[in-house]
């Protein structure tokens, strides 16, 4: 899907949201989440439930999403909660690099194999990455997301080059089959 079409699609979806929602327990409850102070980014983070939680808990946090509508929801909630949140409107499927490094990188419910092979370029050496994406096994119970947005069994670990796996699980979570990886960026 081209950048403009993807943005319009996500803008229409997020136009129905008035609040950011809850943080992702995969991140918020993880024993591998470093203590603040640290920099953090939530990639394809939508309305920012996890990003706002990170910001409220002392992390210098950035939220990246293709949808300005989603980012506006997050910015309004950050203002209401009096937390500092940087937002960046960016298409992760584009060839443009983000141009920053973070201590913690979160990327959930987004799948682009080309992007994942370059994810290490966003993480400081020794930094932590949290990646969660539905697998093709999910199609056994659900027709969406469609096949092109799903990872094959074992594929995610292979795509995340430059990371030492701290945790890797592929299983059913709340009736959704996902691959979940927490990794530490290798020090060159």
Question: What function would you assign to each model-found segment?
Answer:
Residues 97-104:
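A short acidic, Gly/Pro-enriched loop at the edge of an enzyme's catalytic core
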Residues 171-188:
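Core SAM-dependent methyltransferase catalytic element
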């Amino acid at each position: 899907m081209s950048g403009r079409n993807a943005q319009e699609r996500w803008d229409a979806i997020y136009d129905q949201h008035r609040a950011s929602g809850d943080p992702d327990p995969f991140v918020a409850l993880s024993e591998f989440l470093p203590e603040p102070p640290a920099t953090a980014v939530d990639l394809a983070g939508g309305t920012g439930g996890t990003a706002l939680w990170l910001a409220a808990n002392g992390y210098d946090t950035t939220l990246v999403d293709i949808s300005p509508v989603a980012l506006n929801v997050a910015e309004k909630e950050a203002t209401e909660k009096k937390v500092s949140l940087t937002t960046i409107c960016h298409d992760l499927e584009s060839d443009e690099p983000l141009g920053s490094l973070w201590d913690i990188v979160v990327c959930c419910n987004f799948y682009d194999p080309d992007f994942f092979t370059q994810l290490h370029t966003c993480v400081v050496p020794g930094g932590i990455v949290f990646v969660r994406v539905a697998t093709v096994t999910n199609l056994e119970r659900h027709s969406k997301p469609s096949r092109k947005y799903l990872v094959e069994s074992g594929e995610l670990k292979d795509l995340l080059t430059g990371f030492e796996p701290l945790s890797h699980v592929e299983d059913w979570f709340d009736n959704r089959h996902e691959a979940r990886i927490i990794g530490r960026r290798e020090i060159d």
